[in-house]
A protein has these predicted regions:
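Alpha-helical repeat scaffolds
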Residues: 557-564, 596
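Short beta-alpha connecting loops at secondary-structure transitions
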Residues: 90, 407-411, 468-479, 530-533, ...
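Generic helix N-cap/helix-start motif at coil->alpha-helix transitions
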Residues: 538-543, 570-576
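Non-catalytic C-terminal accessory modules of carbohydrate-active enzymes
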Residues: 153-171, 590-735
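Solenoid-like repeat scaffolds
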Residues: 563-570, 600-604
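Active-site acid/base region of carbohydrate-active enzymes
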Residues: 136, 140-144, 292, 302-336, ...
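Extracellular/oxidizing-compartment recognition motifs
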Residues: 19-354, 363, 378-384, 401-408, ...
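Bacterial Sec-dependent signal peptides at the C-terminal "C-region" and cleavage site
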Residues: 8-21
Length: 735
């Protein structure tokens, strides 16, 4: 219900904004370099009010980011979203300014950052711009607004950020702060005009601002005779550095970076500050991430650092779920997985918050699964945004590709695109949210994309290269079977959504294709494992796991497949999620946990990094970043297949509870869209106890593990054929 309220509060992403903004104008500064890379512009507008209205809803669109102060009070910290609900459109924000206003004279100041560069999550319009309108205030941006070009904002010295990032490394020269001349703004167009295009209301919350925190630090000297002040942070976070410094002179260059200055193999975001004489405070507004903040300056500089601090910001949701168990390694993993998930959420889902900040859909399918089980329903809006962006960027020929939004990436990764529309992507979103409207929105795009896929002469999914034939990091990837498995799951999702959206006439063809794929896949069974005849590498654990997950492999093959999994470990942390899920589903949960601890153990126990890795070690394949949330997939496996909680009816109106006590004791709370669900079980010798909370308006089907002769619920004999209504239940089971 809460998610329905959230979505109702947002305008539909595929619809134009029917706005009253006809008198508002896009504006920018009168300066020849206003559209260049890393341009900063300040706007100012005075406003006289006879009285403060009860509501002052204000529409703001900016290319690319903005900070808003009203009467000297911060109203928005980093507003705006990276551009691209579709290739030609932009986002706008809505904020109520009434709490910041007063009777009489008011002043609004907006600091605008124009990226001026395409990135892996941003489509550059080519022009800086701001448009503001409030019907409640009679406010509209136009040439009466003052603006100034800000020469104090510059690019930092090398190394510059890698090509994937649209953001620049900021350099702020305080010696020339405020030197730009105030002028009347230049009017550039109306609401909806090019190059910014159609404006779509922001579908996700504003960032959570945790405020500024000062930190203690240590001091060292590096090889270049620079003083390095290092401050350990509580965890990997999105932060903007804050310094308080006195310089006897002026012109000292103070560098600011984190321990994630290189996201594995590539340079990421850092910043510089040039001092003026005297005492000064500065916050560098371009966010970076890491567990350690470093302030670096020449050893011979006559400066005093009074304090180092940071402002943490993050996605506007809460960690309302919880989990503890009797296995401390899994508890440690859970904490790192949640931290990794959160730092990979902002304008979009990310693969990593340092190197790329890109919405790769293989990652998204795993990140959203974790989010549904542990984050408050507000987080579902980021999945909603990701899904609509993916289909709205579909090419005319039907191709889907990611990451999008993007201006510097155009390649299809066929395996990831099938995953995106599969039962782990679009359909999984529907199961957890109940958002049928989005399924109706996306089905035509799914159908067009699936039409690009064909079968070969054997009835198996034909190879589709796309722009990059990527199935996983690592080696020994049986791509023909991997594509076939994802194709099968995408067809399953399409059939489900076709039935939901009154397109049932499409279902027989989807089922025909699935039957053909399953038969051809099983022809690749050699008696002990699956291999495609054209594949000459070591047998791939990924495709054997996918055979189980799809249901293509029947139970008669499970014992042989178990022996296969004991001998093969080729999957990266990305595809390992599906291997572990397959093991649990085939009754080998204990081995799945052993394999999980063996493979993930080093990153779980790593004392430096509070997040999970892209590869099996720091600096491994794929660039080797140390904050890749695809490594958190086991969180979903535990919630769904060990705690045994999954929706039976979309939106958790009905759900099942099938605990699998391969972990002797687990206690999980899920903040579903229907309310909080708690399941806590403990097995001890011949007894098993389960405590369950069923939210109001929902029903639960409970299946107790086999082997118990007496099952009592709240002191009465349990009838497993009956669904449980809302309430609290205690199951006591004995053998």
């Amino acid at each position: 219900m809460l998610f329905a309220v959230i979505i109702a509060a947002f305008s539909a992403m595929c619809a134009s904004c029917e706005s009253p903004e006809s008198d508002a104008r896009w504006i920018s500064v009168d300066h020849p370099e206003c559209d260049e890379y890393n341009t900063w512009i300040e706007f100012s507008k005075d406003l006289e009010l006879d009285k403060v209205p009860g509501s002052a809803l204000t529409h703001i669109a900016a290319d690319s980011k903005y900070w808003l102060w009203v009467n000297g009070r911060m109203a928005v910290f980093e507003g705006g979203l990276k551009r691209g609900p579709d290739p030609l459109s932009s986002y706008y924000d809505v904020i109520d300014l009434a709490p910041y206003l007063k009777t009489g004279e008011n002043n609004m100041k907006i600091l605008l950052w124009h990226f001026g560069k395409d990135g892996f999550s941003h489509k550059d319009s080519g022009k800086s711009g701001l448009i503001v309108k409030s019907k409640d205030l009679g406010l509209a941006s136009d040439s009466s607004w003052l603006s100034r070009y800000m020469p104090e904002y510059q690019e930092a010295t090398d190394p510059e950020p890698n090509y994937r990032l649209s953001e620049a490394n900021l350099r702020y020269d305080s010696r020339i702060a405020g030197k730009g001349e105030w002028k009347a703004s230049v009017e550039l167009g109306k609401w909806g005009d090019e190059p910014w295009g159609r404006l779509v209301e922001r579908p996700i919350p504003f960032w959570k601002d945790y405020g500024i925190t000062n930190v203690s630090f240590t001091q060292d000297l590096d090889d270049a005779s620079n003083i390095v002040l290092s401050a350990r942070l509580p965890y990997n976070m999105h932060l903007t550095p804050v310094i308080d410094v006195t310089d006897v002179n002026e012109g000292t260059c103070i560098k600011m970076e984190t321990n994630h200055i290189k996201g594995g193999s590539e340079y990421c975001i850092r910043a510089e500050y040039i001092t003026s004489a005297g005492r000064q405070q500065y916050e560098s507004l371009g966010w970076m991430n890491g567990e350690e903040l470093r302030i670096i300056y020449p050893a011979d500089a006559e400066i005093t650092i009074h304090s180092i601090g940071y402002r943490e910001t993050g996605f506007g949701c809460e960690r309302e779920g919880s989990f503890t168990c009797s296995d401390e390694t899994i508890n440690m993993f859970w904490e790192k997985a949640m931290r990794t998930l959160y730092v990979n959420m902002r304008d979009t889902y990310f693969d990593c918050p340092d190197r790329e900040r890109a919405q790769w859909w293989g990652d998204v399918t795993i990140l959203t699964g974790q989010s549904y089980y542990q984050l408050s329903p507000e987080a579902n809006s980021l999945a909603y945004k990701a899904i609509h962006e993916l289909v709205n960027w579909q090419r005319e020929d039907g191709t889907l590709y990611s990451p999008v939004p993007a201006g510097s990436w155009h390649n299809e990764l066929p395996a990831q695109m099938l995953a995106s529309i599969s039962t782990y992507g679009f359909w999984y979103y529907y199961l957890h949210t109940g958002d049928a409207e989005t399924m109706a929105d996306v089905y035509p795009a799914m159908k067009r994309y699936l039409a690009l896929w064909t079968l070969d002469e054997d009835g198996l999914t034909a190879f589709r290269k796309g722009g990059w034939s990527w199935g996983d990091w690592g080696y020994d990837i049986d791509m023909r079977l991997l594509l076939a498995a994802w194709h099968y799951l995408a067809l399953e999702s399409a059939a489900n959504i076709a039935e939901l959206t009154d397109e049932a006439a499409d279902i027989p063809e989807y089922r025909r294709l699935q039957d053909s794929i399953a038969k051809a896949y099983n022809k690749c069974w050699n008696g002990k494992e699956y291999r495609h005849p054209s594949y000459d590498g070591a047998t791939d654990d990924r495709v054997n796991a996918m055979a189980i997950i799809t249901g293509i492999a029947d139970t008669s093959k499970y014992d042989a497949l178990f022996e296969h999994f004991k001998e093969h470990e080729h999957a990266s942390p990305y595809m390992e999620k599906y291997v572990l899920e397959a093991l649990v589903k085939t009754g080998h949960g204990a081995y799945a946990l052993d394999r999980f601890k063996k493979r993930f153990g080093p990153m779980i126990s790593d004392p430096v990094y509070t997040t999970l890795f892209e590869s099996w070690e720091v600096g491994g394949y794929g660039g080797g970043s140390t904050n890749h949330a695809w490594s958190g997939g086991m969180l979903t496996v535990i919630a769904e297949n060990i705690c045994g909680l999954r929706p039976l009816v979309p939106g958790w109106k009905e759900f099942e509870v099938c605990p699998n006590p391969v972990i002797p004791e687990c206690d999980i709370t899920i903040p579903s869209v229907a309310g909080k669900i708690r399941s806590a079980f403990k097995t001890d010798g011949d007894s098993f106890v389960l405590n369950l909370t069923v939210p109001k308006g929902t029903k639960a089907s409970v299946r107790i593990p086999d082997g118990y002769s007496e099952i009592l619920v709240n002191g009465k004999t349990f009838d497993s054929s009956k669904k449980l209504k809302s309430g609290s239940y205690e199951f006591r089971c004995t053998k």
